């Protein structure tokens, strides 16, 4: 046995060094090519055949109907005409829900939020919700309450049996009320004088609300121009409609503007602002994340994507406590106003440098797949490397048998 190995190693071949050099060159070129394709793939610009192409999108909800990702409920605005609300189930079907008339009430749409079971909720009248389903069925739901208030935000915990809403009370103050099957609780006591804006479910009986708070007592502040800071609160409600929700934790943040409040689906909530972000956990802790952004979305895996200002060359992600920076092949061409996630796609709506309204999309399913340039090169490199090793091994074994 030892003799065979010695004779084999003593053999000289003019092709051995050539083969080794070619393989080393292939490895180096492959590494350079992989590094060159390290930017995010799946980025595209343009609304395609969507009806909102060229219009400013104020609110939008994307539905996954299993056929066409373009299914959406859209609120657009045209300065020369007014507000429009319509649904689009495919590239050929656009159904109008609201068109501007002499008195345009479209600006009274305070929010449009996606619920479960292909539903969306909005509000345009006091103590009333409007439910719109994917099939364009519209239901006007009156909230059962002896008080009068406007609804600024509405969110559910797996259905209408447990829900929360941000309200503007008749006395002008901002508050939060719980609901169960559209019966409202008394309002939250707002001793901090917070102007609440949004709310989202955290876990069990806990919710996270965000807003702003005006501080006239800060050093250097003038009573005529007080400091406005972001506010984050954890709200608890045990399900008793005769009892108001309770503020159990409160944090005053920076002077930045909160633009997104996102549930990650694992008993955590991400608060995204233009000066940074916060991670709110079920145990009541609120941790700061140093990622400023213009807009943000959370995907189906619980990963949050932070989208920067126009001209930014990267997109930051946060998942399981880890921050990653994903480089873009080109800078972000839009000043993003709103963004949404549905079925692996991130939809970003905003305005370009010429003042035209556009849409940018990012297909998150392409990353590290065979469709991604880097994924393809990785696959090709591993395939060729495996073939070379098999050929070399077969050659060694064949020659070993001959000696």
Features from the language model and the residues they span:
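Secretory targeting signatures
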Residues: 1-41, 370-403
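Repeated scaffold domains used in trafficking and secretory/extracellular systems
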Residues: 54-64, 104-114, 143-160, 192-204, ...
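Short beta-strand elements that form the blades of beta-propeller/WD-repeat-like
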Residues: 58-78, 110-114, 119-124, 130, ...
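A short helix->beta-strand "capping" segment at the edge of beta-propeller domains
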Residues: 36-56
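Short, conserved, GDST-rich strand-edge loop motifs in beta-rich repeat architectures
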Residues: 76, 212-229, 365
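Surface-exposed loop/turn elements that mediate protein-protein interactions on large endomembrane-trafficking
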Residues: 82-100, 128-144, 166-191, 227-246, ...
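Blade-level signature of beta-propeller repeat domains, shared across WD40, Kelch, NHL, RCC1
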Residues: 333-384, 397-402
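Membrane-proximal low-complexity regions enriched in glycine and acidic/polar residues
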Residues: 252-317
